């Protein structure tokens, strides 16, 4: 598994914790709760994702609400929200990964942490955001 993939998995878990139990961000970013060995660059990338999501969460959540047709925001699982948040952050604020790769990675993370049905939902929301909110890479 790539370092970036590991970082995204850690970020999903951190965002899940933040949503579920609302601990201090500083404590979550120490990753004492994560029991696997990680490299410094994996932790650093996970920290940058989580910090970016937290900083921009209001705008990100507005987009989730706008594009999750027929879904009340409160009914979206915490895991799906975490994956959507980190993926929308990547789509809007980072440029090192192609947009379609970001969406593919989100779908794979959703399959890993949730289900095929959830993966279709996440893919649909992200695809709609990409088509309607983000200028093309070309």
From Swiss-Prot:
One of its GO terms (cellular component) is cytosol. Keywords: RNA-binding, Transcription, Transcription antitermination, Transcription regulation. It comes from the Bacteria. Gene3D superfamilies: NusB-like (1.10.940.10). The keyword Mitochondrion does not apply. InterPro entries: NusB-like_sf, NusB_fam, NusB_RsmB_TIM44. One of its GO terms (biological process) is transcription antitermination. One of its GO terms (molecular function) is RNA binding. It holds the Pfam family NusB. The keyword Transcription applies. Belongs to the NusB family. Involved in transcription antitermination. Required for transcription of ribosomal RNA (rRNA) genes. Binds specifically to the boxA antiterminator sequence of the ribosomal RNA (rrn) operons. This is Transcription antitermination protein NusB. The gene is nusB.
